[in-house]
Amino acid sequence: MVRMNVLADALKSINNAEKRGKRQVLIRPCSKVIVRFLTVMMKHGYIGEFEIIDDHRAGKIVVNLTGRLNKCGVISPRFDVQLKDLEKWQNNLFPSRQFGFIVLTTSAGIMDHEEARRKHTGGKILGFFF
């Protein structure tokens, strides 16, 4: 079976493990985009540490869960988002204001929407978590 979107698979498995109350989840295959997305989530405290396991194939990631994550998901297709349109996306995705993060891929790297606003850059929307 061919995987169409490895980021969507990874976020869905994190979501399911979090709902079941698991402490750890194994994600495979590993990719740079998944690692950067998890780094943004870890920076905000939604997940614990994660460890990349190199098995000389596609690699695996073991993520420690903290129980703080409510939902995470991918936005497909990766829409172009200008700085002024971020507010609309926040209203559509999140249950309330000042709550949750949109992850963007920009020319300055993968970051959350608040950092993109500080750096004054738009980009393509990857996903969200809250």
Swiss-Prot record:
Ranges that cross the membrane: none
Any one cellular-component term (Gene Ontology): cytoplasm
InterPro entries the UniProt entry points to: Ribosomal_uS8 (IPR000630), Ribosomal_uS8_CS (IPR047863), Ribosomal_uS8_sf (IPR035987)
Entries under Pfam families matching the protein: Ribosomal_S8
Cellular compartments annotated: Cytoplasm; Nucleus, Nucleolus
Keyword field: Cytoplasm, Nucleus, Ribonucleoprotein, Ribosomal protein
Domain of life: Eukaryota
Main localization category: cytoplasm
Positions where N6-succinyllysine occurs in the chain: K88
Disulfide bonds: none
GO MF annotation terms: structural constituent of ribosome
Biological process according to GO: ribosomal small subunit biogenesis; translation
NCBIfam families per UniProt: PRK04034.1 (NF003115)
Function, in words: Component of the small ribosomal subunit. Part of the small subunit (SSU) processome, first precursor of the small eukaryotic ribosomal subunit. During the assembly of the SSU processome in the nucleolus, many ribosome biogenesis factors, an RNA chaperone and ribosomal proteins associate with the nascent pre-rRNA and work in concert to generate RNA folding, modifications, rearrangements and cleavage as well as targeted degradation of pre-ribosomal RNA by the RNA exosome. Required for proper erythropoiesis.
Family stated for the protein in its record: Belongs to the universal ribosomal protein uS8 family.
The protein's assembly and partners: Component of the 40S ribosomal subunit. Part of the small subunit (SSU) processome, composed of more than 70 proteins and the RNA chaperone small nucleolar RNA (snoRNA) U3.
Protein name: Small ribosomal subunit protein uS8
Organism: Pongo abelii (Sumatran orangutan)
Species lineage: Eukaryota, Metazoa, Chordata, Craniata, Vertebrata
